[in-house]
């Protein structure tokens, strides 16, 4: 029996570790895996979210700092081409939501988006854990990705350079 329990622990341990990790992929393909301990010391915030289901207070790391920990350009580094970036957030169930990268940066946007790990002073319910996105500025919960597992930055195509013929009258 002890061998069976040990065997199950060895099989399930990687799954538990995977469930407690967040993969961050930069636009150039560089990938960084963040774990709960990586996120534990990042600056945190509370966000009050009022949706049709009622008001709740979420708490967790500020997403801009999570992005920085994942090697993404935020703050003073977010200028020029990175302003064309958008972020695809994917939950463990495959649900996705999209944000503009600048929308997640407190230097560009007043609304704070967090990687919530608590709601109303308690850990998230299992269906939303280990993290979910929470934004006080959204009026609908459609971008509240539960069980956030992946953050991937993609670049919008650069606009074609206009030719002199495009401006002829």
Predicted regions and their residues:
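Bacterial N-terminal signal peptides
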Residues: 5-14
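N-terminal intrinsically disordered, low-complexity segments enriched in P/E/S/T
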Residues: 18-169
